[in-house]
């Protein structure tokens, strides 16, 4: 047996998990019929479509575009725009780690605009991109100092809002499980499970549909279960009623 330290290229995950640890999170889940999206050949844009559907739902529930201020249990930060934090897996020095980027005004962007941003994020090099410069610095610092600096940064409401976004969207790619419940740092964190085929029956016939589980992890300090269920139902309605022409 031997003891090893966690690779410094993954330290940012440890620090963000430490910040998120105290959030009283609850998970709710709905099955989404994505048959129209699949029929339109837009499976590759599923993450962008989901982000758009959530952003539009958040615009319909503006009181939910809020987060508890770091270090407080009763003060809300209410951002001026709807933004999406996206997590990505990147390799730095041969070590795979989780990184994140934020897209602003996702309720105003088209699905195509969101998809272009996602593709740009995927192409960025964790070793050279200026967007990950602060993360690389944190990775190099002694753990105690890095953790302290991150916590100090979160004391700024503006920095906190810019870091976490209105919600987080995380995806595990083509090998995604049917459902995933991650630890949440944002007020909301969403994951879309693997798309599966399912027999659906109605009064006329039996048809094959495509479905996926959408998990929503939310901060119970910001909202209660009933409102969370209504919010998730609106997201489901937005996704299932997705207009194919809106992706262009």
Language-model regions, residue ranges each:
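C-terminal catalytic/motor cores of large multi-domain enzyme assemblies
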Residues: 1-248
């Amino acid at each position: 047996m031997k003891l090893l330290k966690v690779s410094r290229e993954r330290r940012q995950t440890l620090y963000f998990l430490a910040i998120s640890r105290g959030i009283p999170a609850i998970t709710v889940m709905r099955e989404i019929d994505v048959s129209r999206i699949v029929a339109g050949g837009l499976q590759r844009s599923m993450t962008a479509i989901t982000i758009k559907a959530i952003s539009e739902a958040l615009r319909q529930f503006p009181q939910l575009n809020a987060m508890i201020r770091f270090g407080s249990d009763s003060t809300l930060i209410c951002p001026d725009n709807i933004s999406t934090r996206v997590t990505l897996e990147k390799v730095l020095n041969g070590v795979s780690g989780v990184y994140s980027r934020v897209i602003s005004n996702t309720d105003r962007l088209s699905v195509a605009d969101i998809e272009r941003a996602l593709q740009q994020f995927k192409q960025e090099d964790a070793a050279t991109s200026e967007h990950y410069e602060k993360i690389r610095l944190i990775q190099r610092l002694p753990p105690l100092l890095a953790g302290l600096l991150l916590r100090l940064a979160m004391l700024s409401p503006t920095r906190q809002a810019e870091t976490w976004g209105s919600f987080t969207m995380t995806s595990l790619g083509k090998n995604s499980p049917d459902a995933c419940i991650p630890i949440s740092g944002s007020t909301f964190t969403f994951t879309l499970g693997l798309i599966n085929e399912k027999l659906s029956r109605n009064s006329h016939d039996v048809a094959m549909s495509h479905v996926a589980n959408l998990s929503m992890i939310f901060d119970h300090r910001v909202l209660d279960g009933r409102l969370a269920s209504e919010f998730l139902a609106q997201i489901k309605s937005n996704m299932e009623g997705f207009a194919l022409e809106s992706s262009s």
